[in-house]
């Protein structure tokens, strides 16, 4: 929804502040195939580039 950076969820979420629906300090993401422990994963260029929590659209994955 407008103004939200992440899905509020529960207070136990280490990435997203449930009271504000904003990412916690130091977090880059709260969910997604390329989100690992609140950080963008950079496993390889075809799946996770380190720039987003989502896989890139490159013809192979989307």
From Swiss-Prot:
Keyword vocabulary terms for this entry: Cell adhesion impairing toxin, Disulfide bond, Hemostasis impairing toxin, Platelet aggregation inhibiting toxin, Secreted, Toxin
Disulfide bonds: 6-21, 8-16, 15-38, 29-35, 34-48
Location, primary (coarse class): secreted
Tissue: Expressed by the venom gland.
Motif segment (Cell attachment site): 41-42
Record's subcellular location: Secreted
Domain of life where this protein originates: Eukaryota
GO cellular component term of the entry, any: extracellular region
Pfam families according to UniProt: Disintegrin
One MF term in the entry's GO annotations: toxin activity
Residues of the Disintegrin domain: 1-62
Similarity comment: family membership: Belongs to the venom metalloproteinase (M12B) family. P-II subfamily. P-IIa sub-subfamily.
Subunit description: Monomer.
Additional record remark: The disintegrin belongs to the medium disintegrin subfamily.
Function: Inhibits ADP- (IC(50)=63 nM) and collagen-induced (IC(50)=53 nM) aggregation of human platelets. In vitro, inhibits adhesion of endothelial cells to vitronectin, type-I collagen and, to a lower degree, fibronectin and laminin.
Name by which UniProt lists this protein: Disintegrin atropoimin
Species whose genome carries this gene: Metlapilcoatlus mexicanus (Central American jumping pitviper)
